[in-house]
Amino acid sequence: MDFSKFLADDFDVKDWINAAFRAGPKDGAAGKADGHAATLVMKLQLFIQEVNHAVEETSLQALQNMPKVLRDVEALKQEASFLKEQMILVKEDIKKFEQDTSQSMQVLVEIDQVKSRMQLAAESLQEADKWSTLSADIEETFKTQDIAVISAKLTGMQSSLMMLVDTPDYSEKCVHLEALKNRLEALASPQIVAAFTSQSVDQSKVFVKVFTEIDRMPQLLAYYYKCHKVQLLATWQELCQRDLPLDRQLTGLYHALLGAWHTQTQWATQVFKNPYEVVTVLLIQTLGALVPSLPMCLSEAVERAGPELELTRLLEFYDTTAHFAKGLEMALLPHLQDHNLVKVVELVDAVYGPYKPYQLKYGDLEESNLLIQISAVPLEHGEVIDCVQELSQSVHKLFGLASAAVDRCAKFTNGLGTCGLLTALKSLFTKYVSHFTNALQSIRKKCKLDDIPPNSLFQEDWTAFQNSVRIIATCGELLRQCGDFEQQLANRILSTAGKYLSDSYSPRSLAGFQDSILTDKKSPAKNPWQEYNYLQKDNPAEYANLMEILYTLKEKGSSNHNLLSVSRTALTRLNQQAHQLAFDSVFLRIKQQLLLVSRMDSWNTAGIGETLTDDLPAFSLTPLEYISNIGQYIMSLPLNLEPFVTQEDSALELALHAGKLPFPPEQGEELPELDNMADNWLGSIARATMQTYCDGILQIPAVTPHSTKQLATDIDYLINVMDALGLQPSRTLQNIATLLKAKPEEYRQVSKGLPRRLAATVATMRGVNY
């Protein structure tokens, strides 16, 4: 029987009984089941007895073992107490040992200090004795003129002197030693010059060793610089004495300097520890010692060139210098990590330094240059057609000048002159717009658009309008190219000067600007030839403006900017003037006829028809000649305005959409013509005609009854013309026609709802009561 299930945590009596019966006999006789149950009960009783017996035995054993455990615990307690006492004793022994050791170490330290002082005193005595010995022998040594031996003696004296710092006559000994070094240098100088001049590696190495030992290396390098500088300066003197242009002289000088760089670096690598720095300093000193100096030569050459060519000449010289700088950069680049970058920066400044004054005033130079060139572009000619042709051709010339200026800025200032460039471009466009405006005024005078002869015959002449359309197309080309140029300018500025903008730059405060400068200074070393920046130090205000421009272009995108907003606005005004010119050239003939309306004597003079009858029907009257001419002229407008519709000219379309015509539609008026430029112009001319006609009618002093009917007939004719063209007659013209047609006795009733001032004026003109 398995009794282990009684120990399980999830023991269930019912489950156990069911399982026990399932394990019994399979046949279900009642007697068999009772027998099986009795057997189970008996087995359980036996198991209980065994468990009770086992528990009793275990309890007895535990009670017997208890005294032994207590005795063991007591013994362990006594042993722990003894161990504690022993540890206290050991701790006291250790403490005593530490105290004894500390005292011993202190004694040893003091003994060592005494020993060190005694050794130092002994060495000092030895060095003092050595100094005395060497001082006594030095004169004899100098008589030998053996530089190596003299150098060894001086080195020994120098070592001795280092041990005699605290002696009373230390300063006197220093002066004496320096005097001896000077004697050695004077003695060796002819040999040094000979060694450097002949490029003797072995001899030069000896002198490098000697002068290094006596701490006179800078003086030795001075001899080296002087020897080779003399040769290079002589080359420059020879070039200057020849009758050569400055760019040729510069080419010769730079060729000599670059050759010296290559030969001297090869030689100096065998002699000096820092050969590249030595040769770099040689070039720096040579460029600074040129006679005549490069700044003076540049100044004289630019002055000889005159205002027209000064910037061109300057760029020619700069190209030569930039070519030399590129050659040096390529020579330095493979060994850039071996260079003293501070000296390389000085070399870059020495190469580009002569151009710095001109770079700082680049904006003024560029402005003067552009104004001279744009002044040479002819815009006015004797004939109108030639003038129009020149205006059209001037667009390409204008943006050619502007693009050339951008190229010069990138080449001469590496983008740092952007602020000056923008100012120069603004002046260029201002000057051009002024010339263009003067040309338009000249065309107006030649077309006689401002002074209309009072009695001139009415004749159609569309030449002025056709020329005006060409001028409008020119304005459109100006606007289009201005937009393209502005985009190219923004991209060019970012590509050339964008490298100067630090990622940490913030335009919100000057502190942010300063932080960005400091950040740049702490950044890893870059190529000084590519990082040359004359503007940041010499004109920080302009540099700050440049950073603002670059930041704006970078943040807002090069397509969202206002670099040439002033110039763009000026060109838009120019387009507006061209629109006015074209409008006036069309409207001139109409205006000429309408100005006669108020001055016609027939309005208040009784004619033959006046005496016949006032009851003749209105259709018996015909429009007068002035209004017939106007009507026929307006009817011919669609044909002559057709180029606006049929001509595929993107520049013309751009200009027409950018321009605004006079006499815009009244508020609330339907504007179907806005979708078509020709209809737009036709509507503007029609509104101008009706308004001018109304103004002329209202200036008539008085009209007779017959003239009233005639005037109403003329107005009806013009209204019919407008209807025929699909144009809406103006309210004022319709109101005047209504008031003129009203019978005198019905005038007051008819005028109700019409403008009172208009009704009163017409009533006075007709002589009716109102």
From Swiss-Prot:
InterPro entries: COG7. GO terms for biological process: glycosylation; Golgi organization; intracellular protein transport; protein glycosylation; protein localization to Golgi apparatus; protein localization to organelle; protein stabilization; retrograde transport, vesicle recycling within Golgi. It is found in: Golgi apparatus membrane. GO terms for cellular component: Golgi membrane; Golgi transport complex. Keywords: Golgi apparatus, Membrane, Protein transport, Transport. It is a peripheral membrane protein. Its main location: Golgi. Component of the conserved oligomeric Golgi complex which is composed of eight different subunits and is required for normal Golgi morphology and localization. Required for normal Golgi function. Belongs to the COG7 family. This is Conserved oligomeric Golgi complex subunit 7. The gene is Cog7.
